[in-house]
């Protein structure tokens, strides 16, 4: 009998899909991710179901669409009634450990207004055992730095300023003050190795989170100079940001509102004013941060190999969301463009190698990760999960009833650091959009703003809105109906498979039935 399976769920932050060498990013060096891709299956059409971090991680770990979990923005609470991956793992005998963060604001009905968790961007999701948390306020990391003998500056975040400088005007080619040996990526790796070494052969589940390549976009030596800006792909954008802004009121708001200071510690000015040379340098730094994470993963992978646990460990690599990186003159993860939503997903399952090295083109979403892990460990996803297990796709091509489009959402209500709701004159519950997209067309529906429609064959980068073009009227109607049907099929369904009968309670779907609506 084979030993119980281990699971390593690696969740990086803000790593977009087209920065994966196995998918064509040949300008990058990621030997450890490359190994994972060779031994597992890489999903080419994978998206997060929402952005930014908190909502995205809520979907990843609950298996629910934004429309169902309703933790719609960073700082918006997650209803305590929802189960999640960690709670489900406990039901089948695992003690789920977490390194990193989940950016979860707790249900205020379970605490009180003075709870310190309500003063931070987010805390840990219930059910996980923290063995190296970043939150709250990165205290775990800064405490580790101090324990290593590093003299923290009065403003702790100043460790991400360039060496010898008190501020940075924007993009920089300088290394940050902190060394690679003391970076946050190293901190998470050390926590992971400490946890793994203490398991003593017992089965484990570890959520291993990394903060990078999330901003600030500054890397420690030698990663700051590992890539030449001239080797980076050019940004995809109109000749000027004003042309982009004409596409939609929400895009116009972000082009005017997003500041460089959110991406370069101490910088000023609008992100949309970055010239092409600056974007190339920013991308080179971003690539360096990616390689730093990959080198750290190499240490974890080496330990698994040397201790005989590599072959018995399911490894899933993914990101919470993407990053615009100057495409469409934007920085961050906002709006509706692919760059914010398309993310990596690589799955290597212990004992499954029939499709090792394959690139799977089926449409997959972050809500699929939870059902995949639970099924791999002999459990089952909750009835209300919006995702489907990916295990069949590890053995053969997608089944005939697999989804035929991607679905993702974004809520842009005001939070303390961004106020689109106020700027656009909307109520908070009007600040919502959803997207349905296949290989041919992309439809963006807004609760209270004009829709968008793109012909992806003719306009893959989505510059021309065809929603009002009479030639496309029938297509717009078709995809609007697809969006409505998708939402109706995935309405909350925790108890809808039960019914009372004269003979008593009847369950219409067996608990282990894996069928899910597309």
What residues fall within each predicted segment?
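Formylglycine-dependent sulfatase
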Residues: 1-444, 451, 462-478, 508-518
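Charged/polar positions within long, soluble alpha-helices
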Residues: 302, 448, 488-492
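Intrinsically disordered, low-complexity polar regions and short flexible loop motifs
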Residues: 459
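A contiguous, mid-protein "functional segment" used to position or interact
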Residues: 470-497
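Short, charged, surface-exposed hinge/linker loops at domain edges
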Residues: 492-509
């Amino acid at each position: 009998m084979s030993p119980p399976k281990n699971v390593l769920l690696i969740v990086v932050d803000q790593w977009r899909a087209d920065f994966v060498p196995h998918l064509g990013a040949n300008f990058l060096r990621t030997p450890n991710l490359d190994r994972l891709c060779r031994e597992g299956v890489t999903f080419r059409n994978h998206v997060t179901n929402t952005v930014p971090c908190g909502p995205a991680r809520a979907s990843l770990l609950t298996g629910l669409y934004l429309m169902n979990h309703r933790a719609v923005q960073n700082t918006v609470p997650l209803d305590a009634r929802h189960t999640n991956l960690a709670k489900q793992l406990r039901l089948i005998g695992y003690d789920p450990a977490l390194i990193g963060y989940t950016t979860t604001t707790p249900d205020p009905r379970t605490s009180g207004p003075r709870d310190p968790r309500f003063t931070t961007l987010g805390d840990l999701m219930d059910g996980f055992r923290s063995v190296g948390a970043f939150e709250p306020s990165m205290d775990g990391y800064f405490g580790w730095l101090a324990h290593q003998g590093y003299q923290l500056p009065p403003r702790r975040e100043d460790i991400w300023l360039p060496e010898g400088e008190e501020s940075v005007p924007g993009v920089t080619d300088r290394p940050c003050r902190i060394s690679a040996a003391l970076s946050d990526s190293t901190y998470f790796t050390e926590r992971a190795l400490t946890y793994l070494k203490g398991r003593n052969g017992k089965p484990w589940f570890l959520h291993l989170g990394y903060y990078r390549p999330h901003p600030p976009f500054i890397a420690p030596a030698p990663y700051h100079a590992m890539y030449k800006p001239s080797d980076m792909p050019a940004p995809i954008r109109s000749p000027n940001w004003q042309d982009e802004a004409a596409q939609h009121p929400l895009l116009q708001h972000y082009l005017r509102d997003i500041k460089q200071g959110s991406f370069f510690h101490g910088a000023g000015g609008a992100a949309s004013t970055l010239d092409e040379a600056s974007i190339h340098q920013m991308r080179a730094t971003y690539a360096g941060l990616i390689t730093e994470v990959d080198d750290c993963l190499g240490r974890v992978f080496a330990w698994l190999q040397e201790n005989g646990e590599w072959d018995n460990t399911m490894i899933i690599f993914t990101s919470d969301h993407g990053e615009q990186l100057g495409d469409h003159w934007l920085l961050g993860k906002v709006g509706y463009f692919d760059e914010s939503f398309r993310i990596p997903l690589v799955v290597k399952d212990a004992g499954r190698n029939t499709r090792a090295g394959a690139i799977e083109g089926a449409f997959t979403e972050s809500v699929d990760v939870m059902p995949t892990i639970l099924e791999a460990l002999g459990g089952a996803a909750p009835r209300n999960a919006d995702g489907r297990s990916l295990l069949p796709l590890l053995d053969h091509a997608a089944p005939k009833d697999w989804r035929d489009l991607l679905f993702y959402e974004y809520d842009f209500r005001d939070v303390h650091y961004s106020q689109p709701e106020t700027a656009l004159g909307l109520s908070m519950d009007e600040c919502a959009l959803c997207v349905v997209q296949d290989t041919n067309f992309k439809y963006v529906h807004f609760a209270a703003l004009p829709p968008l429609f793109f012909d992806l064959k003719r306009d893959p980068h989505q510059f021309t809105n065809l929603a009002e073009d009479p030639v496309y009227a029938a297509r717009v109607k078709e995809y609007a109906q697809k969006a409505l049907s998708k939402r109706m099929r995935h309405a909350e369904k925790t108890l809808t498979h039960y019914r009372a009968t004269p003979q008593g309670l009847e369950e219409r779907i067996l608990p282990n039935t894996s069928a899910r609506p597309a």
